[in-house]
């Protein structure tokens, strides 16, 4: 869609004023605050054209204009430029997240919290499913003569332990041999690869018929999976209370209930698995719970873990600033993991 330069300028200032103050914008306000070189009649005609093509709308007939979802989309795609600006709080954020980096779950939770605090919106960190993570460590630990703990350590930093109950006792020397054999044949593989090929990899080993190996071979999907770990980390909803859009308690309760249900994880992972814009606005999100919201996301990835950082807020969130914040956060997290 081709707009004149004047229409672009007027649309940009209309949206940015609404983002800042949350009130419909009149031609008089645009004239007095931004465009005194244009008459109010000229500005009014431009606003009428922008409304006609669906970029703006009137809440009431006599009120000023507010952006539509299409207006926000055009603003994000066309009217704001990418920026490599470093936020003022960068060093402080990096220091705090680095201090939490010894424990991956603590780091991800701290990241979501700081993201919400700095953006003054709702921060979310979503990590990808673990099945593509690589097995770095596997340990068999004696709990008793017939109980063994299997410990899996992934390159992402996640650890899983599961107790194996045996029908016969096992001594330390045999356990040590089996443990070393599992290390030799399984470490360096992804969990998916182990699930698909464990029987083939172990069938020629001297201990293949041992009960421990048979337990693992007969049900690899049960044992070589990282389950029960959080995949979604969130900040507090407290920041959203600063916005009039969330003052109506029923709207906020509906949003909160959705975010604290299991469906959140499924929804975000389905959304993040597709090729998509890093900004989705209102009805683009595809769920009625979010029709008055926008989500801005940014991927992060290194050798250990990958995922997305997201910020959710009202549709009038400061898109340019949020994109800068997310870029800074992904840079920090890629350095500290």
Describe these PLM feature segments.
Residues 1, 76, 80-83:
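Generic N-terminal leader/targeting and pre-domain segments
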Residues 1-12:
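Short alpha-helical segments that sit at the start of domains
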Residues 2-3, 38, 67, 317:
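Alpha-helical hairpin
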Residues 11-16, 295-298:
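Contiguous, well-ordered alpha-helical segments that form the cores/surfaces of helical PPI scaffolds
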Residues 13-16, 20, 27-79:
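N-terminal helix-turn-helix
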Residues 59-61, 85-88:
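Short Lys/Arg-enriched helix C-cap and helix-to-coil transition segments
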Residues 80, 87-319, 323-337:
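Intrinsically disordered, acidic Ser/Thr/Pro-rich low-complexity regulatory segments
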């Amino acid at each position: 869609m081709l707009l004149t330069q004047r229409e672009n300028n007027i649309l940009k200032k209309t949206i940015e004023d609404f983002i800042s103050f949350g009130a419909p914008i009149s031609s008089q306000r645009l004239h007095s605050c931004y465009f005194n070189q244009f008459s109010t009649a000229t500005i009014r005609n431009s606003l009428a054209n922008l409304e006609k093509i669906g970029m703006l709308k009137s809440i009431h007939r006599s009120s000023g204009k507010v952006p539509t979802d299409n207006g926000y989309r055009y603003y994000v795609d066309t009217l704001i430029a990418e920026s490599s600006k470093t936020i003022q709080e960068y060093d402080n954020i990096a220091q705090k997240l680095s201090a939490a980096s010894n424990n991956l779950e603590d780091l991800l939770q701290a990241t979501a919290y700081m993201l919400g605090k700095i953006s003054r919106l709702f921060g979310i960190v979503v990590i990808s499913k673990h099945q593509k993570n690589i097995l770095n460590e596997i340990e068999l630990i004696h709990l008793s003569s017939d109980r063994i703990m299997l410990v899996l350590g992934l390159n992402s930093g996640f650890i899983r332990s599961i107790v194996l109950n045996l029908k016969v006792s096992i001594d330390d020397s045999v356990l040590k041999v089996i443990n070393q054999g599992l290390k030799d044949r399984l470490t360096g593989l992804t969990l998916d690869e182990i699930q698909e090929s464990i029987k083939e990899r172990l069938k020629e080993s001297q201990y293949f018929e041992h009960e421990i190996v048979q337990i693992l071979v007969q049900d690899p999907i049960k044992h070589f999976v990282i389950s029960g770990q959080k995949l979604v980390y969130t900040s507090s909803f407290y920041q959203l209370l600063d916005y009039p859009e969330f003052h109506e308690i029923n709207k906020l309760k509906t949003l909160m209930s959705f975010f604290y249900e299991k469906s959140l994880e499924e929804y975000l992972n389905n959304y993040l698995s597709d090729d998509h814009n890093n900004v989705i606005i209102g009805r683009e999100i595809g769920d009625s719970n979010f029709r008055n919201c926008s989500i801005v996301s940014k991927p992060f990835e290194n050798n250990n873990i990958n995922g997305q950082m997201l910020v959710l807020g009202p549709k009038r969130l400061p898109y340019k600033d949020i994109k800068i914040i997310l870029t800074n956060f992904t840079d920090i997290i890629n350095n500290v993991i």
